[in-house]
């Protein structure tokens, strides 16, 4: 009985499923997919909402989302409306199968339009033959494929932004043009599967053109919406733009137009070209494929309604071309044709008039086509013929009557106009400028281009450097330096860098990682004010400034042993790094290893019982240490849950044979103890174990986006960020009672942020993605709580002023930065490298000297280890020739492009009121000042030095040359290079010798002081 009932139930289910058609299943699956995507989108929005709310930047997210939503909806409605209206018109005007009839007398096919036309006006004209029809159809289908490929390719590049790059904001995409067509065709020909996809596309369109062209229209509308909404930052800049109060020299328009408005116009061009071109091509395809044209083997002319429709679309496309030429006039200021970047002789004298002519001609053609689409051009034919007769001064030219008559025939005008316009555009817009450049400009280039070279020099320097902060001085190192001068400059000598970040990191990884899951990813040079040693202190002088190398000990979960990489360990136990090392840059222990001011983990019995790092007493009295936990850093890539059940506490730090544990009590994180929040983040993070674990309690918090680089880019993607965040130990709450006394945190990350654009006129981008840059923002991230603060460092920059208008609550004044943090801001390395590269060429103000590259500079080459490399900018504490006290600067020497002697050095200042100033010291050209390569040659030629290095290299060790530093002292120069010794079996470098060179003397000794005494012949 039971078996019979089960069998009947099974039969009924089978019958029920049979009633459901496959189309119903597809509809159900489609709507299920849509609902799932909507759910995912909603959870993403809610998760971001909670995350921005935690950081107190919710207004930033709301402003961004409002702009994105407005852009998305507007773009989609306009695009979809345009496509649907035109495809619907094409469907209405196309020839139907019932309108095909064969005449008995002529046995020709006559296509009758859907609108009733008197039989007297029906005419049969020669049709497209099958071969021409196939060429037209497959050519247009190929064009549809190229359009789809181009715009979808742009879309995919926008879909998943890389949060590790310097600037997350997308660049303005290139429009669909000949260059993009060639690139796509090359890709298709080199990939057989793309060729197969094109054939499949062709068959689909031929079988059901209206269906598939409508589907592609929906896809393109979605793509347009996504791409344009991704440029919300450009729209906000347009709405809140701030004048630069400086105009370019061609059109005399304020630079703000090029920076804030021109990108939006280019984005509009990108959209309109795709919109009108696809609509135009799709409608032509529908008309050509209608009325059984392929099966009949020919196609008769377009009907009057079809012609009017195509003329309207063609007029819109030509109007877009006119708009494109209007934009191209301004884009000449970014031309690369001439000897320098920006508009040159040919651009201004030939290309600009050509663009204006082609733009006006396109406007006239668009008007002509619109007239044909709305009325009939024959109604004004007599007036146009009279005008042409008047322009020919009454001469009768019968030969052209036929051409004119054809022009006013609807079936001929569109093809003739587009063909002739293309020919004129190639001749006027490409051929003539190329001939002028080769035949007129290049033979007399310097005379033709001088005024434009001046413009490029001026605008490039202004774009990369605040010229008000750049001073150029003559530096003549002819002072005879003595050992007494070194004693009088003791602070400079004590801060000559003997330890580079690379050997320090190697040593840290050998001696200070403590456990395999700890890692020192980076080390940074900074300066701190410490108490002097007791023997050096005086009543009025207790402290001194000292350069140090600081490195954070972060936790890298990927280094946890594979068997221990469980869900609980990843998210609940291995949550944070601990501590840091602090090393003076020029102090060495007896065994040649670097000395540490701060090192190790765990209580130090010789110091305080509650200490967790081994710290020298005078250092502990100089800087705060606290409990240096690092929950937010450069390696914190996992999402963690804190304040969970007590059975799985967070690993704090190793303590002898056991471990110390901790429970996070910081202000960071989002409470997920409630069920709905757990569901949201389980979906957002795609981690369903969050719903199944029993470890969560009502106080449990989720900490995610802990990587500081991704963190700041998620908040402000419109800024460009330095590649090197650096750790600072400071007490910003010094003197305040509201600080967390139980677990005080004193670790902060500082990241330099830049405002950039690639639309600054006449400014040469060289190899950069931008041609304007300012270090406008300093970002401070709390390594324990995760809070982020943005401080405006350059309030004069128009771009950051624009962003302050758009996000009024986001940015703080630099004066609001706590003093303990402000003393650690430094001139950013990335900016300095860009500026030094620009100045190597653009220091030449004379256009003739610039054209001939007579005074071109380069960055010198040094030997590091056994490899040659460009000298990297280096921080040092020194006294500038024009100043009275020592300061922290960033320095880079220059040599001439074809020689090895020093020609100049660039210094960037970092202290106090002088922060941000640049000093360019140029050496006299009539005297020889030894360069880096020349000093390296002197070192290699010294018999004692070369013999000792060769001996080390034969004894199972490897001698490594460190950075060769040029140190300015009292209007003179000394050169210092450390020599490290590293065993082949163990990468633990030790400092064994120091080479010092002054003038043509070179000595190598075990210590810096011995080398200085020897080179200055002190007994």
UniProtKB/Swiss-Prot annotation:
S-S bridge residues: none
Subcellular location: Cell membrane
Pfam families per record: UPF0182
Gene Ontology cellular-component terms listed: extracellular region; plasma membrane
Transmembrane segments: 23-43, 67-87, 128-148, 192-212, 213-233, 270-290, 313-333, 355-375, 416-436
Membrane disposition: Multi-pass membrane protein
This protein's UniProt keywords: Cell membrane, Membrane, Transmembrane, Transmembrane helix
Main location: membrane
Membrane listed as a keyword: yes
Family assignment from sequence similarity: Belongs to the UPF0182 family.
Name of the molecule in the record: UPF0182 protein Tery_0938
Taxonomic source organism: Trichodesmium erythraeum (strain IMS101)
């Amino acid at each position: 009985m039971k078996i019979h009932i089960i069998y009947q139930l099974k039969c009924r289910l089978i019958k029920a499923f049979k009633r459901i058609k496959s189309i119903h299943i597809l509809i159900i699956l489609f709507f299920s997919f849509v609902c799932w995507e909507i759910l995912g989108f909603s959870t993403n929005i809610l998760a971001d909402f909670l995350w921005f709310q935690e950081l107190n930047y919710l207004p930033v997210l709301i402003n961004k989302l409002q702009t994105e939503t407005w852009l998305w909806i507007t773009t989609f409605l306009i695009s979809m409306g345009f496509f649907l209206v035109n495809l619907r018109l094409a469907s209405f005007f196309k020839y139907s199968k019932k309108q095909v009839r064969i005449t008995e007398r002529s046995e020709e096919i006559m296509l009758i339009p859907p609108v009733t036309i008197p039989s007297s006006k029906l005419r049969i004209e020669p049709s497209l033959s099958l071969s021409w029809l196939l060429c037209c159809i497959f050519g247009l289908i190929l064009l549809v494929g190229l359009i789809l490929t181009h715009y979808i390719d742009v879309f995919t590049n926008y879909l998943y932004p890389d949060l590790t790059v310097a600037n997350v904001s997308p660049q303005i995409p290139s429009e669909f043009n000949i260059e993009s067509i060639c690139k796509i065709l090359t890709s298709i020909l080199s990939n057989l599967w793309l060729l197969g996809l094109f054939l499949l596309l062709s068959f689909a369109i031929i079988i059901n053109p209206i269906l598939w062209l409508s589907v592609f229209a929906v896809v393109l509308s979605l793509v347009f919406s996504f791409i344009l909404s991704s440029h919300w930052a450009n729209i906000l800049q347009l709405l809140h733009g701030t004048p630069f109060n400086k105009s370019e020299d061609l059109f005399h328009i304020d630079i703000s137009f090029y920076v804030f408005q021109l990108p939006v116009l280019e984005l509009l061009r990108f959209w309109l070209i795709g919109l009108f071109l696809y609509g135009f091509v799709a409608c032509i395809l529908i008309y050509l494929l209608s009325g059984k044209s392929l099966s009949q083997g020919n196609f008769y002319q377009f009907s009057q309604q079809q012609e009017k429709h195509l003329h309207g679309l063609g007029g819109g496309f030509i109007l877009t071309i006119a708009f494109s030429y209007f934009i191209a006039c301004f884009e000449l200021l970014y031309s690369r044709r001439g000897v320098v970047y920006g508009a040159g002789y040919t651009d201004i004298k030939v290309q600009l008039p050509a663009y204006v002519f082609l733009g006006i001609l396109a406007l006239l053609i668009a008007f002509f086509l619109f007239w044909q689409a709305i009325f009939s051009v024959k109604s004004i034919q007599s007036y146009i013929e009279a005008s042409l007769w008047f322009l020919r001064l009454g001469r009768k030219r019968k030969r052209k009557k036929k051409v004119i008559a054809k022009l006013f025939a609807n079936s001929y005008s569109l093809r003739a106009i587009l063909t002739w316009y293309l020919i004129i555009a190639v001749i006027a817009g490409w051929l003539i400028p190329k001939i002028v450049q080769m035949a007129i400009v290049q033979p007399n280039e310097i005379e033709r281009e001088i005024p434009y070279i001046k413009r490029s020099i001026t605008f490039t320097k202004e774009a990369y450097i605040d010229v008000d902060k750049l001073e150029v001085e003559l530096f003549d190192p002819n002072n005879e330096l003595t050992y007494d001068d070194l004693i009088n400059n003791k602070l400079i000598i004590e801060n000559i860098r003997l330890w580079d970040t690379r050997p320090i990191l190697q040593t840290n990884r050998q001696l200070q990682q403590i456990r395999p899951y700890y890692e020192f990813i980076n080390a940074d040079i900074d300066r701190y004010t410490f108490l002097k040693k007791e023997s050096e202190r005086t009543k009025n002088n207790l402290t001194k400034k000292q350069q140090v190398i600081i490195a954070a000990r972060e936790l890298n979960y990927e280094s946890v042993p594979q068997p221990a990489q469980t869900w609980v360990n990843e998210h609940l136990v291995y949550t944070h790094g601990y501590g840091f090392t602090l090393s003076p840059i020029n102090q060495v222990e007896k065994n040649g290893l670097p000395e540490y001011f701060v090192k190790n983990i765990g209580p130090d019995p010789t110091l305080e019982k509650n200490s967790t790092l081994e710290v020298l007493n005078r250092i502990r009295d100089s800087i705060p240490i606290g409990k240096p936990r690092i929950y937010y850093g450069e390696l914190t890539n996992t999402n963690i849950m804190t304040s969970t059940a007590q059975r799985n506490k967070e690993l704090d730090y190793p303590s002898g044979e056991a471990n110390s544990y901790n429970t996070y009590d910081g202000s960071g994180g989002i409470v997920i103890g409630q069920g709905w929040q757990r569901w949201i983040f389980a979906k957002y993070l795609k981690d369903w174990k969050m719903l199944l674990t029993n470890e969560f309690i009502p106080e449990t918090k989720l900490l995610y986006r802990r990587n500081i680089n991704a963190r700041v880019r998620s908040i402000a993607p419109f800024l460009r960020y330095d590649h090197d965040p650096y750790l600072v130990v400071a007490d910003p709450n010094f003197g305040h009672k509201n600080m967390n006394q139980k677990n005080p945190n004193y670790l902060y990350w500082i990241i330099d942020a830049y405002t950039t654009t690639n639309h600054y006129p006449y400014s040469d981008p060289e190899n950069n993605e931008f041609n304007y840059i300012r270090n406008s923002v300093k970002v401070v991230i709390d390594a324990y709580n995760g809070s982020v603060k943005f401080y405006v460092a350059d309030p004069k920059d128009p771009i950051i002023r624009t962003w302050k208008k758009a996000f009024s609550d986001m940015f703080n004044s630099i004066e609001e930065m706590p003093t303990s943090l402000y003393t650690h801001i430094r001139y950013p390395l990335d900016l300095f490298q860009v500026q030094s590269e620009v100045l190597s060429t653009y220091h030449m103000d004379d256009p003739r000297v610039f054209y001939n590259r007579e005074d071109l500079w380069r960055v010198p080459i040094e030997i590091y280890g056994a490899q040659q490399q460009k000298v990297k900018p280096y921080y040092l504490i020194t006294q500038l020739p024009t100043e009275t006290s020592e300061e922290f600067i960033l320095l880079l020497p220059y040599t001439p492009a074809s020689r090895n002697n020093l020609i100049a050095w660039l210094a960037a200042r970092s202290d106090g009121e002088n922060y941000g100033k640049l000093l360019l010291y140029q050496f006299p050209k009539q005297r020889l000042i030894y360069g880096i390569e020349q000093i390296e040659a002197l070192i290699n030629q010294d018999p004692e030095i070369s013999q000792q290095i060769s001996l080390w290299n034969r004894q199972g060790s490897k001698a490594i040359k460190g950075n060769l530093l040029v140190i300015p002292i009292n209007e003179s120069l000394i050169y210092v290079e450390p020599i490290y010794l590293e065993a082949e079996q163990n990468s633990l470098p030790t400092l064994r010798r120091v080479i010092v060179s002054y003038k043509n003397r070179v000595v190598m000794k075990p210590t810096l002081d011995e080398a200085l005494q020897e080179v200055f012949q002190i007994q």
